[in-house]
Amino acid sequence: PGHQDFSEDTYRTLMAADSAVMVVDAAKGVEDQTRKLFHVCSLREMPIFTFINKMDRDAKNSFDLLEDIENVLGIHTYPVNWPIGSGKEFKGVYDRNSKKILAFTANNGQKEVEKKELTLDDPALEDTIGYYHKQDLFDEIELLDGAGDEFDLEAVRNGQLTPVFFGSALTNFGVEPFLEQFLQLTTPPLPRETVDEKVEPMSDFFSAFVFKIQANMNKAHRDRVAFMRICSGKFEKNMEVFHVQGNKKMRLSQPQQIMAQEREIVDEAYAGDIIGVFDPGIFSIGDTICSPGHKVQFRGIPTFAPEHFALVRQKDTMKRKQFIKGTSQIAQEGAIQIFQELDAGMEEVI
């Protein structure tokens, strides 16, 4: 949130996701880019899980943050845990399910702080969080239980209710409980709409769509990877597939799963998995790949209207070929859009 160049690439990634994590800055509340991307999620009725971050810094009132999310984004909230203080007075979070307090200790420059569990009737509670924080916590729990929304898993999975968690990612406080709950509450791979039908993830035939293309990920040599989301069936290394937009059969070489700088060659993958395959320049964003015996075509991924324009021309006319190839490749990756006059060449483009 807050990054101005964030939306289109993130939008395409959201098209491949089944649920989303919304990170909200506790000091700023909902930002403009969050609003834009949330709109995309709500159109798809995606489950959204909210993590309110930076509680160890000065923050807005927790009730105001929930109200901000509900009013600005139009989604109901259910705090799964509740913060005790904020900034220098941040003492931890209370888990409403387990009825336990996860106490926060000052990190003194450490990347991960020590965690201490307490119950509401623990004699050490007052010494740990302080008398006033204890009284505030009891009052706020009573208010949440009496006036807050009830937890409804079906509403979460329909994108109508967002579970809210508080913590501090920098000190890794509250992150692990959040991820554990996320795994329990999020949906399995969901069905996908095609032009003619709805494809179920447990279908026997293989289908996938390309949502991202990235060049030069390997510094050792120029490469180009097409990332695809598998929607149904089982993918196997070197299997024959049908490229719908190219109208031809092909074999996908070097399938891999990528995590940051790490690459791992995969022999098989299933619905919900993301794989990257070598792209010799034939794939475009939104393309469908499927089993030759069962052809489907997923709906394309819309593009955003451009916001920044520039007139581009090559300095060296002897390098026209490289200029055309380079700009075309960047356009295929979805980073830019190219406009040119009808019947005009590529000497000068927008």
Show the residue positions of the predicted features.
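Structural and coupling elements of P-loop NTPases
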Residues: 1-350
